Structures are given as structure tokens and as C-alpha cells.
Amino acid sequence: QLCMTTARETLRAAASLSPKDICLYVGIPFCPTRCAYCSFVSQSVEKSMKLIPPFLEALEKEIAATAAQVNALGLRVVSVYMGGGTPTTLSAEQLDRLCSVLEDEFDLSAVREYTVEAGRPDTISAAKLRVLRAHGVDRVSVNPQTMSDRVLELIGRRHTAADIERALM
């Protein structure tokens, strides 16, 4: 049943897109710690905090170059997904700046869904959530991986199941 429902919804969503519609992915390759199972390019913030400012400067240039191509081709951004890593490892000020750059460079008026991953409770704060909301983010993806403290410890996460619950309340 779930498989058929998912297939129908996927087909319905695909039918609503035009060939000029695109989805924008912004990758932030930083996390509080590196999980034992992770295969993504990412850096532990503890070990690479000094890399964040130059990374964001380079990302702003890449956003501008990408937006120029998107605009030249007459493409329309219909969704934005900021993933990682853990984008909420950025400070509220850095998130605000990044979202502002996206707004300045891209026409986001047709965006149907704007998602930011916030997979770690130790990276979620009221200030960051206010910034995201102010920029039109309408979906925050929180993926604790597990609610087992033992497994969290084994995979290299520094938080507990109780921390996850507190962050979401």
C-alpha cells in the first residue's frame, strides 16, 4: 500500500513540473562530529571551524555563477534543499547571510518547498529557527538516526535521545 501511494504521489508531483523547473541543492559539508557510517564529504566542526568562513565565501561565488546560468537558461527554481553535512552547524548569522545570498541571486517566488536539514539537536536553536522562518524555510528535516543512546554513542554522535526530545519541544 505504501509503495503504491508513494508511486502515485511521485507521478502526480512530476506531472506538475515543467521542463524548465529545477530543484536547487546547497551542500554544507560540516557536522558537529563525523558519524562512523557517513560516506559524505564532510568535516567535523571541531577540527575545521576555520574552514567555514572561506567555504561560505566560495559558496557565495558558486551561487552567483549558478544563478547566472539558471537565469540565462530561463529556468525556474521550484524547491530549495540545504543539506550536508549539517547546515545548522552554521551560526544564525551565517545562515541568515547564506539565505540572503540565495534570495538575492535566485528568483525564489515559485518555490514550493524550502528545506533545511537540522539533524543534530546540538545545532538547533530558537535564533536559527527564527532566521530560517524569516527566509521562507517551510520544512526542517530533523533526523536523529536513532533514539538509542547506546547506538548514538557507537556511531559517534555526542547527543542523547533526551537531547533530541528537548530540541523538538
Q: Residue spans of the language-model regions?
A:
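Residues at the beta-strand->loop junction immediately N-terminal to the Walker
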Residues: 25-27, 83-84
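Conserved non-cysteine loop/helix-boundary elements of the Radical SAM core domain that shape
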Residues: 42-169
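Hydrophobic secondary-structure block in the mid-to-C-terminal portion of proteins
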Residues: 21-23, 30, 46-50
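Structural motif
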Residues: 21-23, 35, 113
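N-terminal [4Fe-4S]-dependent radical SAM core
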Residues: 1-24, 73
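Local cysteine-cluster metal-coordination motifs and their immediate loop/turn environment
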Residues: 27-42
